[in-house]
Structures are given as C-alpha cells and as structure tokens.
Amino acid sequence: MFEGPLQDVIDEFSRLPGIGPKSAQRIALHLLNEEPEDIERFQSALGRLQRGVTFCRICHNISQEDVCRICADSNRDKSIICVVEESKDIQVIERTAEYRGRYHVLGGALDPLNGIGPKELNVTPLVQRIGGALPDVALGAKGGGASLGDADTPADGESSGADAAETGNAKTAAVETDVEYDEAPEITEVIIATDPNTEGEATASYLGRLLRDFPGLTVTRLASGIPMGGDLEFVDELTLSRAFAGRTAL
C-alpha cells in the first residue's frame, strides 16, 4: 500500500463503479506521470462536470439546461413516453433511430433488499406527466414500499396498490411535485424499457399495474430479443430495434 496523496487518489478511484483496487492503482500511477497541464485539464473537467451538468426538470435525463434537448425538440412525438432506468439507456435507444418520442428516467429500479422502493425512484413525476393521481398506497413506505412480490400476484387476502385503485378501495391523492410544466401533452402510450433482469422486470410489472387503468393510455413493454439478465446498455442496435418493433401490451 502506498502512503499519502497517492494512496488517497487510489482510494477515491476505487470508489467508482467497475474500478477495483488494481485498476485504481494503475490510473493513479498514470496520472502521477502526466504533465502538470494535463492534470490541471483533468481537474478542470471534473469541476465543470459538477457545475455545468444537471437533470432535466421534465424527464430527469442528464442535461446542461433546465430542459434537455430531447424534451425541447418540437419534432419529437410528445404523446409517447419511454421509461428507462438510467440516462445511459437513452443513449443506447437513440442510436437505433427507431424511437422518436420522449423519455422518462426513473433513476434506478425496484430493489427492496437495498432499500430502493417506488419513493426512491422518479415514479411520482411520471404519473404527473401522464396527468393522473396516485393511489395513496401505491408508493408505500420509504425503502420498502414495493417489493419484488408487488410485481407478481398478491398473496391471499392482500392486494397491490394498483389492485386497490382498480376496485375503488384505495383513496387517491394528487401528485405533489415542485416541477412546473410548460405544457401538458396528452400521453397515449408509455413504453417500459427497464433492464430485462429481476429488478427491471419487477419495476416493469409494478408500473404496468400502476398505469394500466389510466383512460386512453396504452402501457407496453419492450418485446423479446433482449437477453434475460442483461443490461440495456450492452444490447446491440439490431436486437433493440427488433425489440421496439415487437413490443407488447402489459
């Protein structure tokens, strides 16, 4: 183990996803041999990243402006929303040139074992965009409001938030948000494009139950062709194009 500033840099790089101690050490040693102006340029870029990048107030995509370029594009189909887990998934879909609607970034997927329930995701702003109201039981308690079981058939004597809304037994509450929208286009379709793994499938099923009773709204899921257990980020364009073409209703 190194000491002092070098070890501090190694420790910081080790905190980044996908970078282990050995990779962090190689990066730190490489930076140690760089010219001072290169180090300053790297530091400047990190500073600009923190100061100059924000999240779109409409879709929560990474943006340099209050509204991202996709939401600001008048040529995009405003009646369709594609729901993804992370901003990186938008980049993958855009490369296919198959989709011309707008997006909504959840900021993750349901993972109750790690304390991620609906309240930790951008579910409420999604419903706000559609123009409806949430059942007061739909979001649940922090960190545990939704379990992977919520996406499946409820146990005897129990009902999900969407089922309760369906039978009229749940109270509804207006969606509270600080976001003000310049326009409220009619949404006719929501495409669920979460990753085809356990958490992504649970999230898709949860959203399908939550949104399926909105009048005039079709909720679809990307079709087969994307391998189970994979990440959307690594799917090739042809496979993703076929998945979009063959999407089915939930």
Curated annotation (Swiss-Prot):
Biological process terms from the Gene Ontology for this record are: DNA recombination; DNA repair
Q: Where are the zinc fingers (C4-type)?
A: 56-71
Keyword Acetylation part of the UniProt annotation: no
**PROSITE patterns (alphabetical):** RECR (PS01300), TOPRIM (PS50880)
Q: Which UniProt keywords apply?
A: DNA damage, DNA recombination, DNA repair, Metal-binding, Zinc, Zinc-finger
One Pfam match, given by its short name, reads: RecR_C
Q: Which InterPro entries match?
A: DNA_Rcmb_RecR, Rcmb_RecR, Rcmb_RecR_Znf, TOPRIM_dom, TOPRIM_RecR
One GO MF term:
DNA binding
The family database entries (Gene3D superfamilies) matched by this protein are listed as: 3.30.60.80, 3.40.1360.10, 6.10.250.240, RecR Domain 1
Extract the ranges annotated as region (Disordered).
Answer: 148-172
What function does the entry list? May play a role in DNA repair. It seems to be involved in an RecBC-independent recombinational process of DNA repair. It may act with RecF and RecO.
Q: Which family does it belong to?
A: Belongs to the RecR family.
Q: Which NCBIfam families match?
A: recR (TIGR00615)
Q: What is this protein called?
A: Recombination protein RecR
Phylogenetic placement of the source organism: Bacteria, Bacillati, Actinomycetota, Actinomycetes, Mycobacteriales
